[in-house]
Amino acid sequence: MGATIGVLCGVLCGALLDAILGTLVRRAEWRAECSAAHPMSFRVQIQPANLGLEVQRDEPILMAAIRHGVGLPYGCRDGACGSCKCRLLAGRVIHGAHQPKALSEVEELAGFILTCCATPQTDCTIEAHQVPAAGEFTVLKMPTRVLSITRAAPDVIVLRLQLPGNQNFQFHAGQSIDFILQGGARRSYSMANSPTRLGQPAAIELHLRHMPGGLFTDHAFAALKERDILRIEGPFGQFQVKPTDTKPIVLLASGTGFAPIKAILEQLQDWGDARPVRLYWGCRVRADVYQHAWAEQAEMDMPNLRYVPVLSEPREADAWRGRVGLVHEVVMADLPDLSGHQVYACGAPVMVHAAQRDLALRCGLPADEFFADAFTSAADRVLA
């Protein structure tokens, strides 16, 4: 009897084991079929640089490029500025929400994509002529401590954030960081000091304009105080001057778009760069030119720099005797031939787009010598 039971148990155990193994095999085959039908990632090839990267399913191409240290061109990362626009040579993508001015229906039909909001559905090949060398600096997440808050204008503060001593945060003048807010929201700001002028303790400088109703700036202007901790991630962006370039430079800023322009000027001065530089800073009224004295001092310290502030709507109380009008139109009046120049523009998207269009059409600026960082607020972004 015991032997019979033992045989039956052996048969049952064997059958159960076979069933389990069969289930595991079928599950593995099902997963393989699902993986083949719905791959977890796609291969994106970048031409003419002949670079490749793996893009996770449902991940925008640009985010994968940043993660891999591959330097695709970009600006806002929100589908608003069009700086990341490139041509899709092969494969298929779908776009997240974006502004028509960044990518029109005609451009999309012609094969152009915005890498900041394009997710691949197949392996793809794209054409991006501005791909620089991969990953010079690592993108880091870190806590920072508010070192100082200075009111520079009625609606502008200069914020200095102390960097943690255990992090080697490196960046180029002109690059930006993201504030990581509660709920995962982010706000981007450009550094206003060059990496050669961090001071002691090492700190980055940011210029914040108050946007009433803004998730971050309402808090920054009403409640932020020294020693508060803010989490950041960076550096991001490719708005930077290369020391190997030799052409005369036009720096074009509107409002707090002056921040990365200031950092670039500091970098040029510390390099001992002798290229002719013109700084045009456009604001609405005199109070908006919140670091006018700094710019005047820079002009005295740099023999190759000419500083031109421009007001679009000066008030009678301003007693303004300087230039008046749209800042990019003042540039065109002063420099009707820009065929041998480089232009670096930062500020409101409307100014950046107008400058890019008009300086090329009316002043002969080569398309590949216009470099831009268009500031986008939450109002400028398109939310899915």
Positions of predicted regions on the chain:
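Reductase modules of NAD(P)H-dependent flavoproteins
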Residues: 17-118, 124, 276-384
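Short, surface-exposed secondary-structure boundary micro-motifs
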Residues: 89-92, 129-131, 182, 235
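Short, structured interface segments
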Residues: 113-136, 228-230
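Ferredoxin-reductase
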Residues: 138-229, 247, 283-285, 310-314
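Short, conserved phosphate/pyrophosphate- and ester-handling motifs at nucleotide-, phospho-/glycolipid
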Residues: 174, 257, 348
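A short, basic/flexible loop-to-alpha-helix module at the beginning of a structural domain
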Residues: 234-245
